[in-house]
Amino acid sequence: PNNQKKKFIALNNIQKEGFVSNIGRHTINEEYRAIKRKVLSNAFGPLAKTLNNANIVMVTSPNPNEGKTFTAINLALSIALEQDKTVLLVDADVLRPSVMKTIDHPFENGLMEYLLGEIDDLSEVIH
């Protein structure tokens, strides 16, 4: 079943933490807009047909505290602010998942519960 659950992120709160927002003009918005343009060009531009899974972006690093969550959230927010784009942000850090905490949402079942077989329906872990 397709559970059309809508979650809202308090943009005022995350803007105070330095995240991208559609409220006002800020340097962080401009910086991620530049990154977003390149990502969207790869995903949907002329090169998209020559690349496998061109619309998938992975933010990763072997080291903690390098800004992976910050970057992933900001890039997702920046793309989501586009009128014709949707974003699925997956926190695949199995040891220290932090996206929900960072955007101040309570923990809910997620990727690990699905992979461990505790949840059968993938739509139940998309929030």
Language model regions located:
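Extreme N-terminal, non-catalytic leader segments
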Residues: 2-57
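Alpha-helical context
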Residues: 4, 8-11, 15, 55, ...
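Helical mechanochemical/support elements of P-loop NTPase systems and associated helical scaffolds
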Residues: 24-31, 35, 68-71, 75, ...
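Histidine- and aromatic-rich ligand-binding microenvironments
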Residues: 7-16, 20-23, 59-60, 65-66, ...
